Amino acid sequence: MEKKESLDSSLKEIVSVCKRRGFVYPGSEIYGGLSNTFDYGPYGVELLQNLKQLWWKYFVHLREDIVGLDSSILLNPKVWEASGHVSNFNDPLIDCKNCKTRIRADKFLEDQKGEGFATGLTLEKMNQVIKESNFACPNCGQRGTFTEARDFNLMFKTSHGASAEDSLDIYLRPETAQGIFLNFKNVVSTTRRKIPFGIAQIGKSFRNEIMARQFVFRTREFEQMEMEFFCEPGTQKEWFSHWVNYCMNWLTEQVGIKKENLRVREHEKEELSFYSEGTSDIEFKYNFGWGELWGIASRTDYDLNQHQKFSGEDLKYQDQVQNKKYVPFVVEPALGVNRLFLAVVTDAYEEEKLPDGETRTVLRFSPKIAPVKAAVFPLMKKDGLPEKSREIFADLSKLGNIEYDDGGAIGKRYRRQDEIGTPFCITVDYDTLKDNTVTVRERDSMSQERIAVNQLKNWLFERL
């Protein structure tokens, strides 16, 4: 119990700094909110954009074998029948008959029995364990009040059409992948890409989660960075290994996440998705424990075969070199943007005890992803210091998001930027007016040095 309370407490600290410093706000807050919805504030948006741009750079722009796509959120409902989501995209649901609380049965059992306990359990076995154990409802505390577990489809249903008579029941997409599969033939035709190659996209997905929780880790509306890599059957294992390593290296070398906070976990056969022959998760050590950050799945030729069957379209690839046609196999690295956001904030967050006995909160983001690259401070709001500061600020703004801050004592301004994760703070003082140098303070070490204004832009550029 003590450990769980400690984990809950540390997550609350993350939530607090995100709200206090404008990273994440509760959704619809002035109307009392809407559970499990969040709005990303000024610094949260900057962090998200930096993460997405960094992903796009390394998964599209720096690779000749990958192109981009932006497919529709709303798709013909037959797509989801073909993909198997209508019949298979379910989680086990139980209700408390006393307080009407709805609970995801497998996660509830793992909370009670330990991580991994529910892996591979059938609904019948879950019902047996719940009945024999006589668990208490986590909401009202009553025992023996749970309904039998049943499948609950996670897709959001809506209507497409102007009137009830001609409206069509459709779904908000639960993953971005299907839009890529539908456009496989278009991309091959228009870009003349040869296998092996990938199609990547960033976009919103929606899942009606039974137990949406743990801040932005599990939400009903979320953003994905997915890539479907098409390869010749028989080569998928080699590519699978390549993408697991490539993704892990990107997280550590580019995003800057500590290696000790990451691990690779291979799925047991019983927990594989209905479309996968093998999946490995890159997990991050969140405040609440290890959780999936990035899933790399070998989807075989399942999706293209299904869409071929249901649509009647020939989705085989014509291999000109080998003079044969085949349905490509697919390896999919699928990353949740919101989970990555929470991972980098958690990884960067530190309450540091200073030599003078004070404590400072600091977010040690890599400069590549920091929402603010540098902040410019005039020491005083007079004697030409603001004018000189504005001049420096305007010049540095070409490097990225630079902030101008003239409010309060310098020490308080440093602390504010530490909580935002700003790598460098630049103070314009009276010596600046004499020798055209500024004080640059580095976030992590808090060390300071004087830099000539005419060298400042290049000095920063080399470190961002």
UniProtKB/Swiss-Prot annotation:
It comes from the Bacteria. It is an enzyme of class 6 (ligase). One of its GO terms (biological process) is glycyl-tRNA aminoacylation. It catalyses: tRNA(Gly) + glycine + ATP = glycyl-tRNA(Gly) + AMP + diphosphate. PROSITE patterns: AA_TRNA_LIGASE_II (PS50862). Its main location: cytoplasm. It holds the Pfam family tRNA-synt_2b. ATP binds at residues 207-209, 217-222, 292-293, 336-339. It is found in: Cytoplasm. Substrate binds at R104, E175, F222, E223, Q224, M225, E226, E332, P333, A334, L335, G336. InterPro entries: aa-tRNA-synt_IIb (IPR002314), aa-tRNA-synth_II (IPR006195), aa-tRNA-synth_II/BPL/LPL (IPR045864), Anticodon-bd (IPR004154), Anticodon-bd_dom_sf (IPR036621), Gly-tRNA_synthase/POLG2 (IPR027031), Gly_tRNA_ligase_bac (IPR022961), GlyRS-like_core (IPR033731). Keywords: Aminoacyl-tRNA synthetase, ATP-binding, Cytoplasm, Ligase, Nucleotide-binding, Protein biosynthesis. The keyword Oxidoreductase does not apply. Its EC number is 6.1.1.14. Belongs to the class-II aminoacyl-tRNA synthetase family. Catalyzes the attachment of glycine to tRNA(Gly). This is Glycine--tRNA ligase. It comes from Leptospira interrogans serogroup Icterohaemorrhagiae serovar copenhageni (strain Fiocruz L1-130). The gene is glyQS.
